[in-house]
């Protein structure tokens, strides 16, 4: 076996050149063979054409004895031509099969030569190159360890499954939220003009404070002269000493467990009354009735109790420490 003295890179380049030259030589041989076959086929067609009719003429002469009619002569001639064409077709088929077998043997021969070329090895006498080759073989033998945790690697199937589950949970949560927002609740309030006038209004938990005030205003206009010309934007809703913005929904306060100065803004659980237990450390969760007031009244009386204690609602502000008075 041939030996090659040089670096691994030069050995690879030499192998590449050998394969390239072998491929070019094979292409040239195929081209030459194709040209030769076409030339032979053309000459054979011409020869077969003339030989075919010569043989038919000779056969017709030998088989015709004495006088025959023109129709008999034509019938014999046509029969001989058909028989001769059948024989030529069979002979051509056998010739094509032989050529096909030769091509298959040639292809097998080429594959064998390619295999032998790919099996060529080069003996490298350089110790560094030998070490590199050994290292490359060791690296090539490395495989995947089935015990290694690959959960942190990207996985399209796993990501699609997680996205599907996440979307299902989101839709389930949305449906549950809409169901809660559609539930009705009863809001107790007092129209406050210095004294309380308690009323109740039923609204959905998804309604805004403004929608609640609109309902409250419709029920109070007939009883209070100053409300007949008032609009919703002129009203304020105070709950647990906090002025609630018009754009917030009751659902927002309930889901966030929003608190006023002394207790939750909206809580539907029943707890013991702290006044009965005489324990100032226990919260009484029953919320007070809210107050609906005209903004003009508040501006005139905000320095007087109870308006002096009212503050704008701030979701970031905590009221955990308080005393019940």
Curated annotation (Swiss-Prot):
**A biological process (GO) annotation for this entry?**
chromatin organization
Q: Which UniProt keywords apply?
A: Acetylation
Tell me the domain of life.
Eukaryota
Q: Where are the stretches annotated Disordered?
A: 137-160
Q: Which cysteines are joined by disulfide bonds?
A: none
According to its record, what are the GO cellular component terms? nucleus
N-acetylalanine: residues bearing it? 2
UniProt cross-references to InterPro entries, sorted A to Z: FAM50A/XAP5_C, XAP5
The similarity comment for this entry is: Belongs to the FAM50 family.
What name has this protein been given in UniProt?
Answer: Protein FAM50B
């Amino acid at each position: 076996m041939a030996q090659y003295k040089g670096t691994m890179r030069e050995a690879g380049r030499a192998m590449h050149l050998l394969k390239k030259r072998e491929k070019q030589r094979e292409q040239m041989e195929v081209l030459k063979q194709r040209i030769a076959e076409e030339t032979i086929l053309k000459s054979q067609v011409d020869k077969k054409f003339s030989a075919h009719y010569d043989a038919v003429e000779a056969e017709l002469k030998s088989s015709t004895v004495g006088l025959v009619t023109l129709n008999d002569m034509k019938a014999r001639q046509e029969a001989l031509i058909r028989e001769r064409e059948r024989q030529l077709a069979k002979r051509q088929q056998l010739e094509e099969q032989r050529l096909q077998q030769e091509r298959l043997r040639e292809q097998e021969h080429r594959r064998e030569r390619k295999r032998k070329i790919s099996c060529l090895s080069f003996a490298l006498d350089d110790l560094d190159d030998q070490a590199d080759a050994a290292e490359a073989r060791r690296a090539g033998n490395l495989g995947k360890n089935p015990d290694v945790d690959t959960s942190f690697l990207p996985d399209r199937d796993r990501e699609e499954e997680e996205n599907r589950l996440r979307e299902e949970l989101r839709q389930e949560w949305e449906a549950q939220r809409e169901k809660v927002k559609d539930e009705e609740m009863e809001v107790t309030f007092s129209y406050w003009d210095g004294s309380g006038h308690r009323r109740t209004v039923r609204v959905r938990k998804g309604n805004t404070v403004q929608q609640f005030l609109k309902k409250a205003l419709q029920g109070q206009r007939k009883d209070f002269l100053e409300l007949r010309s008032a609009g919703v934007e002129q009203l304020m809703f105070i709950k647990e000493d906090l002025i609630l913005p018009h754009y917030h929904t009751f659902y927002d306060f309930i889901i966030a467990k929003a608190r006023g100065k002394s207790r939750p803004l909206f809580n539907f659980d029943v707890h013991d009354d702290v006044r009965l237990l005489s324990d100032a450390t226990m919260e009484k969760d029953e919320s007070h009735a809210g107050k609906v007031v005209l903004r003009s009244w508040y501006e005139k009386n905000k320095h007087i109790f109870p308006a002096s204690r009212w503050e704008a609602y701030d979701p970031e502000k905590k009221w955990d420490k308080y005393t019940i008075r």
